Amino acid sequence: MTYFMKICYVARGHKLLVFSSYSKDGEIMTRLESSLGTAVIRGSTSKGAIKGLINLLRKALTGYSPVITPDGPRGPKYEVQDGLLFLSQKTGFPIIPISWNASKFYRFKSWDSFMIPLPGARVTVTYGQPVIAQANEDKESLRARIKEALMNITKN
C-alpha cells in the first residue's frame, strides 16, 4: 500500500490510475491516493474484477497510466495475476517493473511481507526494463517474463 503512495506522491500532476480493492485497506488507500490527485478504480479478484478491469482499460485508453500490484490483493506473493496480463495484452502498454526498499522499515506478518518505511529511512526506488506484451502471446509466457523482470529488481 505505501508503495502506491510513494509512486502517487512522486508522480503528482501526472495522470496516474490505481486499481484498489473494496477492502477496508482499499478504502483507506483510495482516500489517500485520491487526495494526491490520483484516479482510482475499485475492484478485486473476488469482487467486481471484470467490471473494474473494463473501467481501468477504458480510463487507460484516455491517457491515464495504470499502477497495479502484479500479485493482486491476496497473492500469492510474487505470482503475477491475470488482471495485469489482460490489461497489458489489450492495451499494448509497456509494463514498467518498479520496486522499492528502505534502510529502516517495519515489516508486517502478512502474506506479502508488507513494509512501511520508518522515519528517517532512506528509500530507494528501482525501475526495471519494460516488458512489452504481444496481443497473441501465451499467457504463461507473458506471466513468466513479467515475474522475471520484477524479481531482477526486487530486494527482500
Task: Say what each PLM segment does.
Residues 1-47, 91, 106-107:
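Catalytic core of membrane glycerolipid acyltransferases/transacylases, capturing the structured
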Residues 13-14, 31, 35, 54-156:
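Non-catalytic C-terminal accessory region of glycerolipid acyltransferases
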Residues 21, 44, 48, 72-76, ...:
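Alpha-helix N-cap/loop-to-helix boundary motif
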